[in-house]
C-alpha cells in the first residue's frame, strides 16, 4: 500500500511538473501565434481599406479626367472655327453636353459679350456678366483649364463644379468654354465603387464639407466625422503624402465611436477621397483570433495532460 501511495505521489508530481512545462510552452507558442496572426489580420484589413480608397480615387480621376478632356477638346474645336459661327458653336456645345454628360455647357464670348448655352439660348452681358466672375478672370489670367470649388448654381440650385478652358482663335483670346458637373448626379457612381461590408468612401473638402452623398440636400453639409477628418489632416498634412506608409489615422465618428480613416488627394485638391472603417472592425478581428487561440490552447493543454498522465502511470 505504501509503495502504491509513493508511486501515486510521484505520478502526480510528474504530471504536475510536465503539465506546467506544457502549459508554459503552449502559452508561449499561442502568444507568438496570436500576435503574429493579429499583425497579419491588421495588415490585411489595412491593405483592403487602402485598395478601396485607391479604387475610388482612380474612378474619380478617370471620371473627372474625361470631363476635363472634353472641355479641352471643345475649346480647341471652337478655336478652330473659321468665323465663330453661332450655329456651329451651338452644335459643338450640344455635342459636348451629350457625350460628356455635363449638366450645362457654355461658351462665354469675349468678342460679342454673350454667353452661348448648350440649350441653344444665349445670355447678354446684362443677364450674365461673366467678365466679373472669378472663374472667368482666373481662367483668362492663367491661360489653362481650371476647376472651381463646389458651389450652388444660381439658376437651378444644384451643387456643381465648373471646368473652364480658355478659347484661342487665330492666336487671340476670344472667350472661355465651361461645363457644369452636377455632384449629385455622379455621387452614386463614385460612391458605389467605394463600399464594402466593412468600409465606405467619402469625398471631403479641406473644410470638412461632404462633397458626395446619395441624398442631394446633404452635399456641402458637415458632420462630426467629416470635420474631425478635416481637422486631423490640418494638424498633420503628411497624412495625405503618397510616400507616407502610416496613412491610417483615427477620429471620432458621428456616434462618438472611433473610426479608422485613410485619405488621398485627387486631381482637384479641393476633393479628398477618404475611406472609413469602424475601429471595431480591426479590434473584432483581433478578438476573434484571440478567442480561437485560447480555445485551441486549452484543448491542447487538456489533451496533453491526459496523455502525460496515462504515459506516466503506465511506466511507474
Predicted regions: what they are:
Residues 175-176, 213, 272:
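Short glycine-/small-residue motifs
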Residues 47-146:
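Extracytoplasmic/periplasmic sensory segments of membrane signal-transduction proteins
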Residues 225-293:
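Extracellular/periplasmic juxtamembrane segments that couple receptor/chemosensory ectodomains to their
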Residues 105-112, 200-210:
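Short hydrophobic alpha-helical segments used for membrane anchoring or interfacial signaling
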Residues 98-99, 116-193, 197-200, 252:
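Extracytoplasmic/periplasmic ligand-binding sensor regions of membrane-associated signaling proteins
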Residues 3-39, 43, 294-306:
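Extreme N-terminal signal-anchor transmembrane helix of membrane signaling/transducer proteins, especially
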Residues 91-92, 119-151, 216-250:
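Extracytoplasmic/periplasmic sensor domains and loops in membrane signaling proteins
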Residues 15-16, 33-63, 85, 282, ...:
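Juxtamembrane interface helices immediately C-terminal to a transmembrane segment
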Amino acid at each position: 500500500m505504501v509503495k502504491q501511495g509513493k508511486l501515486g505521489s510521484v505520478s502526480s508530481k510528474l504530471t504536475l511538473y510536465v503539465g506546467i512545462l506544457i502549459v508554459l510552452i503552449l502559452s508561449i507558442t499561442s502568444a507568438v501565434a496570436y500576435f503574429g496572426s493579429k499583425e497579419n489580420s491588421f495588415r490585411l484589413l489595412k491593405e483592403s481599406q487602402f485598395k478601396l480608397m485607391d479604387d475610388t480615387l482612380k474612378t474619380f480621376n478617370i471620371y473627372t479626367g474625361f470631363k476635363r478632356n472634353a472641355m479641352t477638346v471643345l475649346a480647341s474645336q471652337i478655336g478652330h472655327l473659321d468665323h465663330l459661327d453661332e450655329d456651329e458653336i451651338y452644335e459643338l456645345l450640344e455635342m459636348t453636353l451629350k457625350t460628356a454628360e455635363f449638366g450645362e455647357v457654355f461658351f462665354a464670348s469675349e468678342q460679342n459679350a454673350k454667353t452661348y448655352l448648350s440649350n441653344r439660348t444665349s445670355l447678354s452681358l446684362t443677364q450674365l456678366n461673366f467678365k466679373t466672375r472669378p472663374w472667368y478672370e482666373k481662367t483668362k489670367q492663367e491661360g489653362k483649364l481650371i476647376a472651381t470649388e463646389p458651389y450652388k448654381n444660381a439658376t437651378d440650385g444644384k451643387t456643381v463644379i465648373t471646368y473652364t478652358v480658355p478659347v484661342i482663335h487665330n492666336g487671340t483670346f476670344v472667350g472661355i468654354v465651361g461645363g457644369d458637373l452636377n455632384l449629385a448626379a455622379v455621387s452614386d457612381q463614385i460612391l458605389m465603387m467605394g463600399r464594402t461590408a466593412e468600409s465606405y468612401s467619402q469625398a471631403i473638402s479641406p473644410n470638412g464639407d461632404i462633397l458626395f452623398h446619395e441624398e442631394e440636400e446633404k452635399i456641402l453639409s458637415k458632420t462630426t466625422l467629416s470635420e474631425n477628418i478635416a481637422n486631423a489632416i490640418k494638424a498633420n498634412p503628411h497624412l495625405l503624402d503618397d510616400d507616407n506608409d502610416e496613412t491610417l489615422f483615427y477620429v471620432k465618428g458621428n456616434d462618438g465611436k472611433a473610426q479608422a480613416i485613410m485619405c488621398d488627394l485627387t486631381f482637384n485638391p479641393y476633393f479628398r477621397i477618404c475611406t472609413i472603417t469602424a475601429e471595431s472592425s480591426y479590434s473584432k478581428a483581433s478578438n476573434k483570433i484571440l478567442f480561437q487561440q485560447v480555445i485551441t490552447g486549452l484543448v491542447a493543454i487538456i489533451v496533453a495532460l491526459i496523455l502525460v498522465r496515462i504515459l506516466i502511470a503506465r511506466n511507474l
